Amino acid sequence: MSKVLILKSSILGGYSQSAVLIDHLASHWETQGAAITVRDLGGKDVLPMVDGEIASGLRGGAELSARQQEMLALSDTLVAELKANDTIVIAAPMYNFTIPAQLKNWIDFIARAGVTFTYTETGPKGLVEGKRAVLVTTRGGAHKDGPTDHVVPYLKTVLGFIGITNVEVVYAEALNMGPEAHDKGMSEAKHSIDQLKA
């Protein structure tokens, strides 16, 4: 049985197009027997914003404040959750040409030297290996493979850095370019999702 971690990151609630697609994917994969865990980073599971105190605490050490200890424990939980699943599904709506701050914050909590990556004499090495990632990205315009897409290249870089190089992408484009374009973009994305195996 495949274990799947789904990360939602939209702040739009019921208006979220990425949430519609993620729910479609979850329903599709549940029929295949996948065990799914959902973390709603833009809703009920929003994380504290990583600031200087938290960033310092995530490096560990003997003299941590109570807040740093709490945030380090949270980071450990998020990393354990990441490592416990076979597939990571990331809902990545494009906000002002990049990912939501809530998703970037999750990355800041899990990207830890000595925990999810390490530095060697030959360069960095990811420690979260043998995983698969699926990116579901929604955008109002058409940006795929263009210079304005800072979502997919960035996420592929981050995932590769921690060891996840098997990355598939589902695009839903031109969603704000009229009703016909919206319906076409969502339909094509759902079709792509239907081809994915859990």
From Swiss-Prot:
Cofactor note: Binds 1 FMN per subunit.
Its EC number(s): 1.6.5.-, 1.7.1.17
Binding site for FMN: 10, 16-18, 94-97, 138-141
GO molecular function, one term: FMN binding
Pfam families per the UniProt record, alphabetical: Flavodoxin_2
Enzyme class name: oxidoreductase
Keyword Oxidoreductase in record: yes
Key word Phosphoprotein present: no
Cofactor: FMN
Gene3D superfamilies: 3.40.50.360
Similarity field: Belongs to the azoreductase type 1 family.
Function comment: Quinone reductase that provides resistance to thiol-specific stress caused by electrophilic quinones.
Protein name: FMN-dependent NADH:quinone oxidoreductase
Gene: azoR
